[in-house]
Regions:
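Intrinsically disordered, low-complexity polar/charged tails and linkers
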Residues: 1-143, 149-151, 157-182
Length: 182
């Protein structure tokens, strides 16, 4: 069974915003020399929103699209209540940039053998450099990290449907391979 562990989404919440003023008003740390965005944290749902002076907001840490929307709504309402001019939040203007999914195959995997059986030009396995097998899927465009424990990380999907398709594709690939008990 797969599980979404992170979603990254972006949207425009205003034309531009003075992050120093936001920092002073909301008592949020902002160090432009360190990072050009301000980190706005929401407790429930637990997400971080990177707010840039251009008015762009990038949500990280969400586990669902609903959490993305709720986190943005909380921030926009907070800023509006403190006198900042914000645009109305529209769901269709929120763009999912990346979804990270984990999957546990449940069996130990021999990555050396697996790398020989999977499509050569889509697979990288160099255990001296990285302990997992890297498997690239063309459609939907995504990258899978497969570990000998049977645990997998799938990243690069732009929708929950794509994440499920990529997981299904990886599962099909793994199910055609023999399992190994070490």
């Amino acid at each position: 069974m797969s599980e979404i562990v992170n979603m990254v989404a972006s949207t425009q919440v205003t034309e531009s915003i003075d992050l120093y003023e936001v920092s002073d008003t909301l008592n949020i740390d902002y160090e432009a020399e360190q990072f050009p965005g301000m980190v706005y944290r929401v407790a429930d749902p637990k997400v971080c929103i990177l707010l840039f002076r251009s008015g762009k907001a990038v949500v990280t840490g969400a586990k669902s699209k609903e959490a993305v929307e709720k986190g943005l709504s909380i921030m926009v309402e907070d800023l509006t209540n403190h006198g900042f001019e914000m645009w109305p939040l529209k769901t269709e203007d929120i763009s999912l940039e990346n979804i990270v999914v984990t999957y546990n195959h449940g069996d130990l995997l021999d990555l050396s053998t697996l790398s020989l059986h999977m499509q050569f030009d889509k697979t990288e396995y160099e255990p001296e450099v990285f302990p997992g097998l890297i498997y690239r899927i063309d459609e939907p465009k995504s990258v899978c990290l497969v570990f000998s424990s049977g645990k997998c990380v799938i990243t690069g999907c732009k929708s929950e449907e794509e994440a499920q398709e990529a997981t299904d594709h990886l599962v099909d690939q793994l199910n055609t391979m023999p399992t190994f008990g070490f």
